[in-house]
Amino acid sequence: MNIDNDLRRIALQEQQLQFERFDLDTAWKLGVTLRRMAAERKLGCVIDITLFSMQVFYAALDGATPDNPNWVRRKRNTVFRLFKSSYATGLSLLKQQTNLQAKLGLADAEFAAHGGSFPIVVKGTGCIGAVTVSGLPQRDDHNLVVEALAELLGANHDELKLES
């Protein structure tokens, strides 16, 4: 893994994986897509889609743990605060050899700079929420979200996915 390459690719993901519009039906389709992918691969995880106003999708699959919802909340809080993916935040901090507490005064109990939460962006509006996965290694959490977004938006996942 090359941090600079990953950060460039995540910036491309965040630029291309944006919606023309996003409503509750779109949230359902995204959530069901993520759940299908996770179930087919037998991935024990939690899936959450939350807009700034309310939670609009939640699913826990076999293998998820009681800690996963807290990880979802903390990663989602990071997206809501910084308007970029939690994985990009974590990699940027790793590159700077710091953390959220030291750099921004954000408590670990409330924020997590670990992969798996991705901003829901509506073109011309900005970030309106976050889609989050927790339960896998952080890179895999991030990759699953990106794959589902690419499928739903008709984007070329091969051009967007992180290098192995």
Curated annotation (Swiss-Prot):
Name the PANTHER family for this protein.
PTHR28255, UPF0303 PROTEIN YBR137W
This chain's source organism reads: Sinorhizobium medicae (strain WSM419) (Ensifer medicae)
What lineage is this protein's organism placed in? Answer: Bacteria, Pseudomonadati, Pseudomonadota, Alphaproteobacteria, Hyphomicrobiales
A Pfam family found in this protein is HbpS-like
List the protein's name: UPF0303 protein Smed_2872
Q: Where is the signal peptide?
A: none
Highest taxon of the lineage: Bacteria
Residue spans making up a coiled coil are none
From the record, give the transmembrane residue ranges. none
HAMAP family referenced in this protein's UniProt entry, alphabetically:
UPF0303
Among InterPro entries, the record links this protein to: PduO/GlcC-like, PduO/GlcC-like_sf, YBR137W-like
Stated family: Belongs to the UPF0303 family.
